[in-house]
UniProtKB/Swiss-Prot annotation:
Known function: Involved in the regulation of leaf growth angle. Promotes horizontal shoot growth.
InterPro entries: TAC1
Residue span of motif IGT motif: 55-61
Region (Disordered): 243-263
Keyword annotations of the record: Growth regulation
Tissues where this protein is expressed: Highly expressed in leaf sheath pulvinus. Expressed in shoot apical meristem and leaves.
Organism of this sequence: Zea mays
Name listed for the protein in its UniProt record: Protein TILLER ANGLE CONTROL 1
Gene that produces this protein: TAC1
Presence of keyword Chloroplast: no
Gene Ontology BP term (one): phyllotactic patterning
Highest taxon, organism lineage: Eukaryota
Record flagged with keyword Nucleotide-binding: no
Similarity-based family: Belongs to the TAC family.
Length: 263
């Protein structure tokens, strides 16, 4: 079905004699009269006419002129035509030699260098050239902006793009650094050495630890309950019983020292 539609469109766009509707008997007579080799050449020419253009596959253009799709090929063909015309004019002038001085002067006037003929540029080509120029100007503008930002210093930090800000090394600020900054701001302005900064940081951390200990000490503690009388008696009895079981020799020693019991 797709091939039928393609052939119908090809016949509509290219109204050649081969595609015209001719009576069947007449077509057979014409076919018999035309040699077989000529028919093969014509079919090959028709196939290659719309399929190949300077080695480029052109199927799917649906009969439109392929030169409009490639403006570079059009410009080259125009240049060739102009060069051929100029060569033909020069050859004609060389063949017709003037016979008198007046004719020579006329020919000299005619052979003066004329204005160069510029080839017509297609809109697609002009559009591509303008796009290239715009891209080049944008690229140059970005280069200039980046160089200005690099040379500007700290005044142009806010104008830099966000990607450049990510390269800055981030320093972690601790609680000791904050306490040290408070001490520096409250004290009189003087030069501090590295040892002074370390001492202030250690003092701030120890102060923080002592504050935490005080908070823990301030928590209310439950008083230990006093043991009851019954529990005290029970613990005393248990200690006695355990002492008898664990150390029976003590009891034997006591009994021997006291002597035999009398009834």
């Amino acid at each position: 079905m797709g091939l039928k539609v393609f052939h119908w469109l090809n016949r509509r766009m290219h109204s050649n004699t081969e595609y015209c509707s001719i009576h069947g008997s007449k077509a057979m007579e014409d076919k018999d009269s035309v040699p077989h080799s000529v028919v093969e050449k014509d079919t090959e020419a028709l196939l290659l006419h719309d399929v190949l253009l300077n080695g480029i596959l052109a199927i799917g253009t649906l009969g439109h002129h392929v030169d409009s799709l490639c403006p570079v090929a059009c410009i080259e063909e125009d240049d060739l035509f102009i060069m051929d015309d100029e060569k033909a004019i020069v050859e004609e002038r060389d063949d017709e030699e003037p016979r008198n001085d007046q004719v020579k002067e006329d020919v000299a006037l005619e052979t003066e260098p004329c204005e160069p003929v510029w080839p017509i540029v297609e809109p697609a080509k002009m559009h591509s050239l303008s796009m290239k120029e715009d891209n080049f100007t944008c690229f140059v503008a970005e280069e200039i902006l980046i160089r200005e930002v690099e040379d500007g210093g700290g005044a142009n930090i806010q104008e830099r793009p966000l990607l450049m800000l990510e390269k800055v090394e981030k320093v972690r600020t601790t609680l000791a650094d904050l306490f040290a900054a408070e001490v520096f701001s409250s004290s009189s302005p003087r030069e501090y050495s590295c040892q002074d900064i370390i001492d202030v940081a250690v003092a701030s951390t120890s102060k923080h630890a002592s504050c935490m200990e005080k908070m823990h000490q301030k928590k209310p503690r439950k008083p230990t309950p006093k043991p009851l009388k019954a529990t005290r008696k029970l613990s005393r009895v248990m200690r006695k019983m355990l002492g008898k079981k664990i150390h029976p020799e003590q009891l034997n020693g006591r009994s021997n020292a006291e002597g035999p019991l009398t009834a």
